[in-house]
Amino acid sequence: MSIFISPSNNTGWGLRAPSKMYGGAXQRSTQHPVRVRGHFRAPWGALKGRVRSRTTVDDVIDQVVADARNYTPAAAPVSTVDAVIDSVVSDARRYARAKSRRRRIARRHRSTTAMRAARALLRRARRTGRRAMLRAARRAASGASAGRTRRRAATAAATAISSMSRPRRGNVYWVRDXATGVRVPVRTRPPRT
């Protein structure tokens, strides 16, 4: 004859697993209470869960959360004196940077004595070229009845001078003049000897 014992924690009938008696504890205590019912269980055929209607408290909480999410801190009032000082300092720094950059560029492209001599020669040529052009123009204006050859020579001289004064791209070769012994800048490449 078998004896049926009903345990108090509703795990089933009999003493199949004594360890399951009080939720794993050997004996019931305040530190390890037995959980009888965990959650609300609706009867079969009822709705899946309780539908709770929204309350005013829910709306207030939602509004507070939305405000916190969209919060942007107000900009601190900017002092006009500070702004003026900052702008003056930044302008001074920019000016100093530009000045040092100009100095660096000037140092990088410092001209040699040969380059300075070439520039002086070109300046002199331009000056004399302008004078010659003016002279040729005066001659052409005064001697309108002058011969065709003179007019042609004047225009040729004027074009040569203008082409000489116009800055041209290309190489400049320094050649020693046989008569004077001075180095002269020339555009055409000297023959190799």
UniProtKB/Swiss-Prot annotation:
Propeptide position ranges: 2-24
Motif interval(s): Nuclear localization signal: 183-193
Key words, A-Z: Acetylation, DNA-binding, Host nucleus, Host-virus interaction, Late protein, Phosphoprotein, Viral penetration into host nucleus, Virion, Virus entry into host cell
Originating gene: L2
Subunit structure: Interacts with the core-capsid bridging protein; this interaction bridges the virus core to the capsid. Interacts with host NPM1; this interaction might play a role in placing the pre-histone-like nucleoprotein on the viral DNA or regulating viral gene expression. Interacts with host HMGB1; this interaction inhibits host immune response.
UniProt miscellaneous comment: All late proteins expressed from the major late promoter are produced by alternative splicing and alternative polyadenylation of the same gene giving rise to non-overlapping ORFs. A leader sequence is present in the N-terminus of all these mRNAs and is recognized by the viral shutoff protein to provide expression although conventional translation via ribosome scanning from the cap has been shut off in the host cell.
Source organism of this protein record: Human adenovirus E serotype 4 (HAdV-4)
Listed InterPro entries: Adeno_VII
Free-text function comment from the UniProt entry: Plays a role in the inhibition of host immune response within the nucleus. Interacts with cellular nucleosomes and immobilizes the host immune danger signal HMGB1 on chromatin. In turn, prevents HMGB1 release out of the cell and thus decreases inflammation. Also plays a role in the wrapping and condensation of the viral DNA. May also promote viral genome import into the nucleus.
Site (Cleavage): 24-25
Stimuli inducing this protein: Expressed in the late phase of the viral replicative cycle.
Family, per entry: Belongs to the adenoviridae histone-like nucleoprotein family.
Any one of the GO CC terms: host cell
PTM: Cleaved near the N-terminus by the viral protease during virion maturation to form the mature protein.
Single GO term (MF): DNA binding
Entry-annotated residues carrying Phosphothreonine: 55
This protein's name: Pre-histone-like nucleoprotein
Modified residues annotated as N-acetylserine in this record: 2
One Pfam family this sequence matches: Adeno_VII
Modified sites of kind N6-acetyllysine: 48
Single GO biological process annotation from the record: viral penetration into host nucleus
